[in-house]
């Protein structure tokens, strides 16, 4: 697979941006994941995490999760929190967790809701799950609470992007650890461009206080939730200059929403698709693009969490 790398100067000329390098990943339109059944659960052990409450946003009593440590790891290792998409835990977390553990990084994939159980209250309803998970991770004697990362898909991608904001971090609670690096996958940038400037939205103005931390976004150029083929440009342009400098958007050319899905291709209707206008969404797995994204994410977390 070839990568077409654009210099900062080229990106600025074409898109009015001066703050990052964009990689377009040329992908083939492959319709099914690689042979063999996908592993649905992340490697490790099942754990039940005590819940927490975020006033005005919601509460959770307990959070089911899968926690895995690297084999033969040193006494303390970094860890990545994995947040699933609207369809629940579906194998994508396991796909990345295995590779992260092999690279020396522990993983914690939490279950925020079951398939079909997307909260009507929106993203704020699952922020308590993430806060509880981060608290639990820092309490583990084998995890270095100063070296935490967060990644997520779609619903979880939006969460992982928002958690890079100090405004959101303050709502999570002063005792909740601040992760050091974030890797959102297709976080539906077009919708967040509107939500973040809406005073009625619980995440209003979160973009104005994005932290200066490394952030790697993956999104397909044919994502049916988005408007246009470079949907995250406008969102990242809203962030403070220092945060923009630490952000990389990796566009997967020809990639759909969920291009790294570990289940067969599907179509469905979603009211939030097409930049909030609603309509049909295609999810077409591309194993080649998924493998490259996994390599990029593992390299990203290895660089910034230093296992």
Locate predicted features.
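Primarily recognizes the serine-hydrolase "nucleophile elbow" in alpha/beta-hydrolase
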Residues: 131-210
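Short alpha-helix in the alpha/beta-hydrolase fold that links the catalytic acid
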Residues: 227-238
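N-terminal cap/lid segment of alpha/beta-hydrolase-fold proteins
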Residues: 39-73
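Bacterial N-terminal signal peptides
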Residues: 21-31
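Short beta-strand/loop motif that positions the catalytic acidic residue
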Residues: 217-219
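C-terminal catalytic histidine-bearing segment of alpha/beta-hydrolase fold enzymes
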Residues: 244-307
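Short substrate-entry loop that stabilizes the transition state in hydrolases
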Residues: 73-77, 82-119, 191-192, 224-228
């Amino acid at each position: 697979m070839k990568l077409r790398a654009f210099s900062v100067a080229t990106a600025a000329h074409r898109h009015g941006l001066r703050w990052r390098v964009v990689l377009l990943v040329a992908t083939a339109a492959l319709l099914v994941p690689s042979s063999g059944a996908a592993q649905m659960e992340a490697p490790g052990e099942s754990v039940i995490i005590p819940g927490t409450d975020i006033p005005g946003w919601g509460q959770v009593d307990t959070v089911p999760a899968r926690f895995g440590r690297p084999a033969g790891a040193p006494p303390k290792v970094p860890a990545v929190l994995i947040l699933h998409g609207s369809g629940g835990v579906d194998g994508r977390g396991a796909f990345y967790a295995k590779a992260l553990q092999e690279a020396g990084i522990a993983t914690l994939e939490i279950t925020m809701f079951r398939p079909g159980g997307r909260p009507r209250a929106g993203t704020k309803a699952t922020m308590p799950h993430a806060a509880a998970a981060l608290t639990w991770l820092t309490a583990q004697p084998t995890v270095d609470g100063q070296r935490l990362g967060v990644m997520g898909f779609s619903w979880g991608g939006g969460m992982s992007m928002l958690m890079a904001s100090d405004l959101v971090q303050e709502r999570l609670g002063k005792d909740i650890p601040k992760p050091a690096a974030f890797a959102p996958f297709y976080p539906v940038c077009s919708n967040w461009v509107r939500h973040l400037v809406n005073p009625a939205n619980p995440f209003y103005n979160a973009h104005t206080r994005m932290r200066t931390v490394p952030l790697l976004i993956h999104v397909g150029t044919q994502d049916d939730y988005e408007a246009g083929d470079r949907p995250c440009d406008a969102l990242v342009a809203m962030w403070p200059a220092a945060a923009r400098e630490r952000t990389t958007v990796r566009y997967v050319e020809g990639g759909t929403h969920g291009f790294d899905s570990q289940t067969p291709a599907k179509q469905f209707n979603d009211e939030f698709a097409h930049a909030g206008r609603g309509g049909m969404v295609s999810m077409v797995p591309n194993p080649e693009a998924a493998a490259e994204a996994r390599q990029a994410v593992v390299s990203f977390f290895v660089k910034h969490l230093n296992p």
